[in-house]
Swiss-Prot record:
NCBIfam families: S6. One of its GO terms (cellular component) is ribonucleoprotein complex. PANTHER family: MITOCHONDRIAL 28S RIBOSOMAL PROTEIN S6, SMALL RIBOSOMAL SUBUNIT PROTEIN BS6M. The gene is rpsF. The keyword Ribosomal protein applies. It comes from Synechococcus sp. (strain WH7803). This is Small ribosomal subunit protein bS6. Signal peptide: none annotated. One of its GO terms (molecular function) is small ribosomal subunit rRNA binding. GO terms for biological process: translation. Belongs to the bacterial ribosomal protein bS6 family. InterPro entries: Ribosomal_bS6 (IPR000529), Ribosomal_bS6_CS (IPR020815), Ribosomal_bS6_sf (IPR035980), Ribosomal_S6_plastid/chlpt (IPR020814), Transl_elong_EF1B/ribsomal_bS6 (IPR014717). SUPFAM superfamilies: Ribosomal protein S6.
Length: 123
């Protein structure tokens, strides 16, 4: 039995975009994939980082990672929209084989597991 591959799309937004607009971009691209028939597994904003080299006269960019399932048709739809957007300065989609990534745990969202008590010996 073969596992269905999943895809990871990393895209970089212009650094001068307001925070509200960044959130709308995250929602926009996730919704495009869902409408095209993909299952979105994870949508992570990696934050503003310095670029290795200038892209379109920008030295920084806002990195976003999007993991999704699908038959591959959705990738073309997503990349077409990103190509036409002035806010996306670079994007890359990679097909991943193998098991799906473990769900990410956001720090502070779950209480810490209790630590097992160790017996202290006194001599």
């Amino acid at each position: 039995m073969t596992q269905q591959p999943y895809y990871e799309t990393m895209y970089i937004l212009r650094p001068d975009i307001p925070e509200e607009e960044v959130e709308s971009h995250l929602t926009k691209y996730r919704d495009i994939l869902v409408e095209a028939g993909a299952d979105v597994l994870d949508n992570q904003m990696r934050g503003k980082r310095r670029l290795a080299y200038p892209i379109a006269k920008h030295k920084e960019g806002i990195y976003v990672q999007l993991s999704h399932n699908g038959d591959g048709q959705q990738v073309a739809v997503l990349e077409k929209v990103m190509r036409l957007s002035e806010d996306v300065i670079r994007y890359l989609t990679v097909k991943q084989e193998g098991p799906l990534p473990a769900p990410r745990v956001v720090p502070g969202s779950e209480p810490a597991a209790p630590q097992p008590e160790t017996a202290e010996t006194s001599a």
